[in-house]
Swiss-Prot record:
The active site is at H40, H188. This is 2',3'-cyclic-nucleotide 3'-phosphodiesterase. Substrate binds at T42, S190, Y193. Involved in the metabolism of ADP-ribose 1',2'-cyclic phosphate which is produced as a consequence of tRNA splicing. It holds the Pfam family CPDase. GO terms for biological process: cyclic nucleotide metabolic process. Its main location: Golgi. One of its GO terms (cellular component) is Golgi apparatus. Its EC number is 3.1.4.37. It catalyses: a nucleoside 2',3'-cyclic phosphate + H2O = a nucleoside 2'-phosphate + H(+). Residues 133-159 are annotated as: Disordered.
């Protein structure tokens, strides 16, 4: 998943408190010790971010969060709530073992499309084209992946870099993002991460009882946007930065 953008409810709000309560309760129904995580909707994964240079990482995080906040705040105020909870569902996938479906509100879909276009598709496609146009800037790592060469400390001739027009790439990215938002964007709020499968009927009865014990007539304010490095164990995921949405 790499770096993901999460939309989270604000702490100490009814939405946050109720989700945390039910997530903690449901965790006890599953074997082992399912990892704990914040309630969130994943807007998109695989956001392009330079993690090698910490100073550049901070600048990129601030830039992406600032632009995301502007995009969120520019959405039409023509709905009661951007996030509307649906049914509880389950899949074989570890990260979608148990989750609330979330209605694909047009504004939520529009926001996800914008973020996907600007911070996933455009930078990835520009990088792919740059590899074609300027192969001298890249090398292979031990796993055979193409990576940028590190600047040489030795004095040498300046490497000539070929410039290229990115307008077509950006136009194509808009279409790719629109297609992704319709076919792949699947907003949901995970409640439990687990390898358990299938979920037997007795477990489902307990799940439904614990969920129905809580009044879900709640409004999700715009909340908080967070950039999260989702690599390795869930307990090791790192919040790189966040911004409140008012």
């Amino acid at each position: 998943m790499g770096v993901a953008l999460w939309l989270c409810p604000k702490r100490n709000t009814p939405t946050y408190d109720k989700l945390i309560t039910v997530m903690s309760s449901l965790n006890t129904l599953f074997p082992g010790s399912p990892p704990k995580f914040e309630p969130h909707i994943t807007i998109t994964t695989n956001i392009s971010l330079d993690l090698a240079d910490q100073s550049k990482t901070k600048d990129d995080v601030d830039r992406i969060l600032s632009a995301s906040a502007v995009a969120m705040n520019s959405l039409p105020k023509n709905h009661e709530s951007l996030v509307k909870l649906g049914n509880v569902n389950s899949q074989r996938k570890f990260f979608k073992k148990l989750y609330f479906e979330v209605e694909k509100d047009p504004n939520l879909v529009s926001f996800a499309r914008i973020i996907r276009e600007l911070f996933v598709i455009v930078p990835q496609d520009i990088e792919k084209e740059n590899i074609k146009q300027n192969p001298q800037l890249y090398t292979k790592d031990n796993n055979g992946n193409t990576i940028r060469r590190k600047p040489s400390k030795k004095k040498s001739k300046t490497t000539e870099v070929k410039e290229f027009d990115t307008s077509f790439i950006r136009q194509a990215a808009a279409y790719k993002a629109a297609e992704w938002s319709v076919q792949e964007f699947d907003p949901h709020i995970s409640l439990v991460y687990s390898d358990l499968w299938p979920l037997h009927s007795a477990l489902w009865r307990n799940i439904n009882t614990r969920i129905s014990d809580i009044d879900w007539d709640i409004e999700w304010e715009f909340g908080v946007l967070k950039l999260v490095l989702c690599e390795g164990d869930v307990n090791d995921w790192v919040v790189l930065g966040s911004v409140d949405i008012h």
